[in-house]
């Protein structure tokens, strides 16, 4: 293979590239997606509070154990994003969660960003912190069994947002994170989330998403990120939560695929959508619609869902040991539905019950 020298000399060896590419491909294998279980202590506390359960380490461990010990989870889940606390936790039998997942053929991942902070010089926009000592942290998580990482940046649609500065800064932060991850053997999941808060229509959501993706992939190129060893975790293109105009699943699918075709290089192995506060059923139906669009789609299109996989699971569990099997059955059902949707083979289901409830949270943070 030809080598590149000078200012464009590769910082990664071929062996490093091969490993990153293989991990990315494993995560986006047909019919599978990611379970995002990386909620911060505060966020998971809100979920536990909804079922009248105290937010303490014991209950958080018990809930994550319920998720990760679900029988046959690996039939539909290829990766799990962990929060740092969860990364260090074990089952009641003393087996580390990371080892439990690896044994099932599921790739453990880690949330590396440290949350959104205000971006000076903008009107209400933010950037994401956590770059300090990131290389050390990434190396430690790789040594501990993780194969990938996630970093979330947030942009909102308003009269004057997202601004040029907001898009540029967040794209560069994502690119710095991605290059550091790859140097330490972790596949970076790049997450530029355009929030669904607002009154904007589908067309504006599509335009903003296209612009954000353009900034992101320019920054990734500037930072010499190896695209074949990355994954993208974007929002679907939907009207704003307060928009007067609604959109069908088919319209959302077409707008989303169109935006991706205009902004995401074919070298990227896969796109793992966030659910963005959609109901469980909408998140699944929209993923199915995206995969059913009759346009060229060079990437795998699958899911990286948190709320849209867990909301009805939490309700089924209710914090009671006698409900664990029922809750795990619910998780397996939702995972299979989304796995089918990632293939464009979701047949739909009854729109009654918890799965149909909106999971929208204004200005949502993890």
Swiss-Prot record:
Q: Does the keyword Lyase apply?
A: yes
- A GO CC term attached to the entry: cytoplasm
Q: Can you list the disulfide-bonded cysteine pairs?
A: none
List the active-site residues. Answer: 191 (proton acceptor), 233 (schiff-base intermediate with dihydroxyacetone-p)
Q: Which reaction does it catalyse?
A: beta-D-fructose 1,6-bisphosphate = D-glyceraldehyde 3-phosphate + dihydroxyacetone phosphate
Determine the domain of life of the protein's source.
Eukaryota
UniProt-recorded Gene Ontology molecular function terms: fructose-bisphosphate aldolase activity
Pfam family membership, one: Glycolytic
Give the EC number: 4.1.2.13
Please report which protein family the annotation says this sequence is part of. Answer: Belongs to the class I fructose-bisphosphate aldolase family.
UniProt-recorded name of the protein:
Fructose-bisphosphate aldolase 2
Organism annotation: Caenorhabditis elegans
């Amino acid at each position: 293979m030809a080598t590149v020298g000078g200012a464009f000399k590769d910082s990664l060896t071929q062996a490093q590239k091969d490993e990153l590419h293989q991990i990315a491909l494993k995560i986006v294998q047909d019919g599978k997606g990611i379970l995002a279980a990386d909620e911060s202590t505060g966020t998971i506390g809100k979920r536990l509070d909804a079922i009248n359960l105290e937010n303490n380490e014991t209950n958080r461990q018990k809930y994550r154990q319920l998720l990760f010990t679900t029988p046959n989870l690996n039939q539909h889940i290829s990766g799990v994003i962990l929060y740092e606390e969860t990364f260090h936790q074990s089952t009641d039998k003393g087996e580390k969660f990371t080892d439990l997942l690896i044994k099932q053929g599921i790739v453990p991942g880690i949330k590396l960003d440290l949350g959104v902070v205000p971006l000076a010089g903008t009107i209400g926009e933010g950037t994401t912190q956590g770059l300090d000592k990131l290389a050390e942290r990434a190396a430690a998580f790789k040594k501990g069994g993780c194969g990938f990482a996630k970093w979330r940046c947030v942009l909102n649609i308003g009269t004057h947002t997202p601004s040029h500065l907001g898009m540029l800064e967040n794209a560069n932060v994502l690119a710095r994170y991605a290059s550091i991850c790859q140097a330490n053997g972790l596949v970076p999941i790049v997450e530029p989330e355009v929030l669904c808060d607002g009154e904007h229509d589908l067309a504006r959501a599509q335009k903003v998403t296209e612009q954000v993706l353009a900034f992101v992939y320019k920054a990734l190129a500037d930072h010499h990120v190896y695209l074949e060893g990355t994954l993208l975790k974007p929002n679907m293109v939907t009207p704003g939560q307060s928009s007067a105009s609604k959109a069908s699943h088919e319209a959302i699918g077409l707008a989303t695929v169109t935006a991706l075709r205009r902004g995401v290089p074919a070298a990227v192995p896969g796109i793992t959508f966030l659910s963005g506060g959609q109901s469980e059923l909408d998140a699944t139906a929209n993923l199915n619609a995206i995969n059913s669009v009759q346009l060229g789609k060079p990437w795998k299109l699958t899911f990286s869902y948190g709320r849209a996989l867990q909301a009805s699971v939490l309700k089924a569990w209710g914090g009671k040991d006698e409900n664990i099997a029922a809750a795990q059955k619910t998780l397996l059902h939702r995972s299979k539905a989304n796995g089918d949707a990632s293939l464009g083979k979701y047949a739909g289901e009854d729109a009654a019950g918890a799965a149909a409830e909106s999971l929208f949270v204004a200005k949502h943070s993890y």
